[in-house]
A protein has these predicted regions:
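Generic structural signal for well-ordered, non-transmembrane alpha-helical segments
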Residues: 98, 102, 114-117, 121-124, ...
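Bacterial Sec-dependent N-terminal signal peptides
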Residues: 1-32
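A cross-kingdom marker for long, charged
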Residues: 224, 228-300
Length: 300
């Protein structure tokens, strides 16, 4: 099993080749949204292909997607660090550790400052509630406070810290705690994307594409969560995610024949574009349900 940080957001698609979830190729139909360039077919020049993650996304990968989409700075969207003392149960602490991890990755996009340090300290405090030694994060915090000039180094330090956190949980037979952290991170990534870059009045096809592609990631997440059905909290939130999946199941994503590549080692599809049958009404339902679910998660 890879590190928790590696499995985090977006997210091992176990049923990608089954008939129910098979990849669809373009036939005769009218797409609602398309990200294919008009000159992407029939030209001699090679077309650069975008990557579609179908595995569980890391905060670094989520951050890269946010960067491409031009997500604006709005810290009011994040879960305030002041909430940390109110998460008393292990399940709430687990979920919000994942949420704070994605918030940290989001803040990293806009430079390094005290706010970013505050989220690191919060993640450390939350992990303490889970019985994780605070030195996993204390040392990275000290190093970052001493030298805040290298953003990539910061993410590497945080990656190492989360790896140690996951190893500690696994060694103690607490895999379900790691599962809840993964889930919290994915929901937070969806919340930020649907709140800050999705505009229902004038939807950007590339933004719509990234949200729609999460139907693959959600399938992966549900398969991942199945491993921890001995935890009633996991069962509870899995039911919530299955309800959300109903909205994703109402539309299809199509690729042109010969255009799609699958890299199983990196858990990505590569394509020069896609066409979707998703409607704004469905996207709004996804946005609203994610917001409702996220509110429940961050409420003490």
């Amino acid at each position: 099993m890879k590190s928790l940080f590696s499995y985090l957001v977006i997210f091992l698609l176990l049923f990608i080749y089954s008939s129910k979830h098979e990849l669809k190729y373009k036939d005769t139909f009218e797409p609602v949204f398309s990200t294919y360039k008009t000159d992407s077919a029939g030209t001699l020049a090679p077309v650069e292909k975008d990557e579609i993650f179908y595995g569980l996304l890391t905060p670094v990968e989520i951050c890269a997607i946010f960067n491409r989409l031009g997500v604006p700075y709005n810290n009011a969207t994040l879960n305030p660090t002041s909430n940390r003392d109110q998460y008393l149960s292990s399940s709430k602490a687990s979920i919000n550790t994942g949420i704070y991890g994605v918030d940290f990755g989001y803040l990293k996009m806009f430079g390094i400052g005290q706010e970013m340090i505050n989220y690191m300290v919060t993640i450390r405090d939350m992990s303490n509630k889970l019985g994780i030694p605070d030195n996993f994060l204390t040392e990275p915090i000290k190093r970052i406070q001493a030298d805040m000039s290298e953003p990539d180094t910061i993410m590497s330090l945080m990656n190492d810290a989360f790896t140690k956190m996951e190893d500690h949980l696994r060694a103690g037979g607490r895999e379900s705690t790691a599962g809840l952290m993964v889930m919290g991170g994915w929901v937070e990534a969806m919340f930020i994307a649907t709140q800050l870059v999705y505009n229902p009045a004038k939807p950007d096809p590339e933004v719509v594409e990234k949200i729609a592609e999460q139907k693959y990631t959600l399938t992966t997440l549900l398969s991942f969560m199945k491993n921890y059905y001995d935890d009633p909290v996991v069962v509870y939130y899995t039911k919530k995610l299955k309800f959300l999946k109903n909205y994703f199941d109402t539309f299809d994503i199509y690729f042109k024949k010969g255009d799609l590549e699958i890299d199983r080692s990196k858990q990505v599809f590569r394509s020069s574009g896609s066409e979707m049958t998703v409607t704004v009404e469905t996207l709004n339902k996804i946005r609203d349900y994610v917001s409702k679910l996220r509110t429940e998660m961050v409420t003490p």
